[in-house]
Protein backbone atom coordinates (compact mmCIF):
# COMPACT_ATOMS: atom_id res chain seq x y z
CA UNK A 1 0.00 0.00 0.00
CA UNK A 2 1.35 3.40 -1.02
CA UNK A 3 0.51 6.66 0.74
CA UNK A 4 -1.38 8.11 -2.25
CA UNK A 5 -3.12 4.97 -3.53
CA UNK A 6 -6.65 5.86 -4.70
CA UNK A 7 -5.65 9.54 -5.16
CA UNK A 8 -6.29 10.88 -8.67
CA UNK A 9 -4.30 13.88 -9.95
CA UNK A 10 -5.02 15.86 -13.11
CA UNK A 11 -1.67 17.21 -14.27
CA UNK A 12 -1.77 20.21 -16.62
CA UNK A 13 1.92 21.00 -16.16
CA UNK A 14 4.85 21.25 -18.57
CA UNK A 15 8.64 21.64 -18.47
CA UNK A 16 10.18 20.87 -15.05
CA UNK A 17 8.65 22.36 -11.87
CA UNK A 18 5.09 21.09 -12.31
CA UNK A 19 6.03 17.66 -13.67
CA UNK A 20 8.49 17.25 -10.77
CA UNK A 21 5.66 17.98 -8.31
CA UNK A 22 3.31 15.45 -9.89
CA UNK A 23 6.09 12.88 -10.35
CA UNK A 24 6.52 12.91 -6.55
CA UNK A 25 2.79 12.14 -6.24
CA UNK A 26 3.06 9.31 -8.77
CA UNK A 27 6.02 7.90 -6.82
CA UNK A 28 3.73 7.67 -3.78
CA UNK A 29 1.09 5.76 -5.71
CA UNK A 30 -1.21 8.48 -7.04
CA UNK A 31 -2.92 7.98 -10.38
CA UNK A 32 -1.53 10.97 -12.29
CA UNK A 33 -3.16 11.83 -15.61
CA UNK A 34 -0.90 14.16 -17.59
CA UNK A 35 -3.04 16.29 -19.90
CA UNK A 36 -1.07 17.65 -22.84
CA UNK A 37 -1.88 19.94 -25.74
CA UNK A 38 -1.75 18.29 -29.19
CA UNK A 39 1.77 19.66 -29.76
CA UNK A 40 2.93 18.02 -26.52
CA UNK A 41 5.12 19.15 -23.63
CA UNK A 42 8.25 20.94 -24.93
CA UNK A 43 10.32 18.64 -22.72
CA UNK A 44 9.56 15.76 -25.11
CA UNK A 45 12.30 17.08 -27.40
CA UNK A 46 14.86 18.01 -24.72
CA UNK A 47 18.24 16.35 -25.11
CA UNK A 48 19.57 13.79 -24.46
CA UNK A 49 17.38 11.43 -26.45
CA UNK A 50 17.36 7.67 -26.08
CA UNK A 51 15.60 5.67 -28.78
CA UNK A 52 14.08 8.96 -29.98
CA UNK A 53 12.62 9.90 -26.59
CA UNK A 54 13.84 12.55 -24.14
CA UNK A 55 15.35 11.03 -21.02
CA UNK A 56 14.48 14.22 -19.09
CA UNK A 57 10.83 13.94 -20.10
CA UNK A 58 10.82 10.27 -19.14
CA UNK A 59 12.35 10.96 -15.73
CA UNK A 60 9.81 13.70 -14.96
CA UNK A 61 6.76 11.82 -16.19
CA UNK A 62 7.34 8.17 -15.40
CA UNK A 63 4.41 6.45 -13.75
CA UNK A 64 1.84 8.83 -15.26
CA UNK A 65 -0.99 8.25 -17.69
CA UNK A 66 -1.27 10.56 -20.69
CA UNK A 67 -4.21 12.28 -22.35
CA UNK A 68 -4.11 14.71 -25.28
CA UNK A 69 -6.70 17.50 -25.14
CA UNK A 70 -6.94 20.82 -26.95
CA UNK A 71 -8.27 22.95 -24.08
CA UNK A 72 -9.34 25.66 -26.53
CA UNK A 73 -12.13 23.34 -27.69
CA UNK A 74 -15.38 23.18 -25.66
CA UNK A 75 -15.55 19.38 -25.93
CA UNK A 76 -12.10 19.10 -24.31
CA UNK A 77 -13.20 21.35 -21.44
CA UNK A 78 -16.25 19.10 -20.99
CA UNK A 79 -13.93 16.07 -20.71
CA UNK A 80 -11.93 17.82 -17.97
CA UNK A 81 -15.13 18.76 -16.13
CA UNK A 82 -16.12 15.08 -16.11
CA UNK A 83 -12.67 13.95 -14.97
CA UNK A 84 -12.51 16.51 -12.17
CA UNK A 85 -15.60 14.99 -10.53
CA UNK A 86 -13.49 11.97 -9.56
CA UNK A 87 -10.17 13.80 -9.10
CA UNK A 88 -8.58 14.77 -5.81
CA UNK A 89 -5.95 17.20 -7.08
CA UNK A 90 -5.38 19.52 -10.04
CA UNK A 91 -1.89 20.92 -10.67
CA UNK A 92 -1.22 23.49 -13.40
CA UNK A 93 1.61 25.85 -14.29
CA UNK A 94 0.18 28.09 -16.98
CA UNK A 95 0.61 31.84 -16.67
CA UNK A 96 -2.00 33.30 -14.30
CA UNK A 97 -5.34 33.71 -16.05
CA UNK A 98 -4.89 31.01 -18.70
CA UNK A 99 -6.91 28.33 -16.90
CA UNK A 100 -9.64 30.92 -16.19
CA UNK A 101 -9.86 31.64 -19.93
CA UNK A 102 -10.35 27.92 -20.51
CA UNK A 103 -13.00 27.84 -17.76
CA UNK A 104 -10.81 25.45 -15.76
CA UNK A 105 -9.55 27.61 -12.88
CA UNK A 106 -10.30 26.75 -9.25
CA UNK A 107 -13.49 28.83 -9.10
CA UNK A 108 -14.82 27.17 -12.27
CA UNK A 109 -13.96 23.61 -11.21
CA UNK A 110 -15.00 23.82 -7.56
CA UNK A 111 -18.75 23.42 -8.31
CA UNK A 112 -17.90 20.10 -10.01
CA UNK A 113 -15.89 18.92 -6.98
CA UNK A 114 -15.96 21.00 -3.76
CA UNK A 115 -13.23 18.84 -2.16
CA UNK A 116 -10.74 19.49 -4.97
CA UNK A 117 -7.18 20.53 -4.09
CA UNK A 118 -6.02 22.99 -6.78
CA UNK A 119 -2.36 23.99 -7.08
CA UNK A 120 -1.38 26.76 -9.50
CA UNK A 121 2.39 27.04 -9.94
CA UNK A 122 3.79 30.31 -11.25
CA UNK A 123 7.05 32.22 -11.12
CA UNK A 124 5.82 35.48 -9.61
CA UNK A 125 2.52 34.59 -7.95
CA UNK A 126 -1.08 34.60 -9.17
CA UNK A 127 -1.62 38.32 -8.50
CA UNK A 128 0.51 41.44 -8.33
CA UNK A 129 2.50 43.54 -10.78
CA UNK A 130 4.79 40.73 -11.97
CA UNK A 131 2.20 37.92 -12.08
CA UNK A 132 2.05 37.84 -15.89
CA UNK A 133 5.80 37.64 -16.41
CA UNK A 134 7.09 34.40 -17.90
CA UNK A 135 9.39 32.52 -15.57
CA UNK A 136 11.82 29.74 -16.31
CA UNK A 137 14.48 28.65 -13.84
CA UNK A 138 17.33 30.76 -15.29
CA UNK A 139 15.14 33.88 -15.02
CA UNK A 140 14.31 33.09 -11.39
CA UNK A 141 17.96 32.29 -10.65
CA UNK A 142 18.87 35.80 -11.86
CA UNK A 143 15.98 37.73 -10.29
CA UNK A 144 16.25 35.98 -6.91
CA UNK A 145 19.95 36.69 -6.45
CA UNK A 146 20.98 33.04 -6.83
CA UNK A 147 23.29 33.91 -9.73
CA UNK A 148 24.87 36.71 -7.70
CA UNK A 149 25.58 34.24 -4.90
CA UNK A 150 27.22 31.93 -7.46
CA UNK A 151 29.50 34.75 -8.67
CA UNK A 152 30.76 35.26 -5.12
CA UNK A 153 32.30 31.76 -5.22
CA UNK A 154 33.99 32.09 -8.62
CA UNK A 155 37.75 32.64 -8.73
CA UNK A 156 37.58 35.47 -11.27
CA UNK A 157 34.93 38.06 -12.13
CA UNK A 158 32.73 36.94 -15.03
CA UNK A 159 29.15 36.01 -15.78
CA UNK A 160 27.81 33.37 -13.39
CA UNK A 161 28.66 29.77 -14.21
CA UNK A 162 25.81 27.83 -15.77
CA UNK A 163 23.93 25.77 -13.21
CA UNK A 164 23.47 22.25 -14.56
CA UNK A 165 20.47 21.68 -12.29
CA UNK A 166 17.56 24.08 -12.47
CA UNK A 167 17.38 24.63 -8.72
CA UNK A 168 14.39 26.99 -8.94
CA UNK A 169 12.32 24.37 -10.79
CA UNK A 170 13.23 21.50 -8.46
CA UNK A 171 12.54 23.56 -5.33
CA UNK A 172 9.29 24.96 -6.75
CA UNK A 173 8.04 21.48 -7.62
CA UNK A 174 9.02 20.15 -4.20
CA UNK A 175 7.33 23.02 -2.34
CA UNK A 176 4.21 22.68 -4.51
CA UNK A 177 4.10 18.97 -3.62
CA UNK A 178 4.34 19.91 0.06
CA UNK A 179 1.54 22.48 -0.28
CA UNK A 180 -0.76 19.91 -1.91
CA UNK A 181 0.01 17.34 0.78
CA UNK A 182 -0.62 19.93 3.54
CA UNK A 183 -3.94 21.20 2.13
CA UNK A 184 -6.18 18.43 3.58
CA UNK A 185 -4.58 18.85 7.01
CA UNK A 186 -5.14 22.61 6.91
CA UNK A 187 -8.76 22.09 5.88
CA UNK A 188 -9.37 19.71 8.77
CA UNK A 189 -7.98 22.30 11.19
CA UNK A 190 -9.68 25.38 9.72
CA UNK A 191 -12.71 24.08 7.78
CA UNK A 192 -11.65 26.48 5.01
CA UNK A 193 -11.34 25.38 1.40
CA UNK A 194 -8.96 27.33 -0.80
CA UNK A 195 -6.43 26.67 -3.54
CA UNK A 196 -3.01 25.37 -2.49
CA UNK A 197 -0.48 28.12 -3.23
CA UNK A 198 2.23 27.01 -5.62
CA UNK A 199 4.04 30.21 -6.55
Task: State where each predicted segment sits.
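Beta-strand segments within the central parallel beta-sheet cores of soluble alpha/beta enzyme folds
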Residues: 195-199
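N-terminal helix-loop segment corresponding to the beta1-alpha1 unit
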Residues: 1-188, 192-194
Amino acid sequence: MNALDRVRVLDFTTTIAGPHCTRLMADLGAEVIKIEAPEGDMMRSRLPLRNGASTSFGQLNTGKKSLVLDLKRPEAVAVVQRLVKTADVVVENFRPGVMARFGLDYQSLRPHNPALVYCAISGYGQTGPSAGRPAYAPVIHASSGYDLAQIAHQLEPRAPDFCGIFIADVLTGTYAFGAVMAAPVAWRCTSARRPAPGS
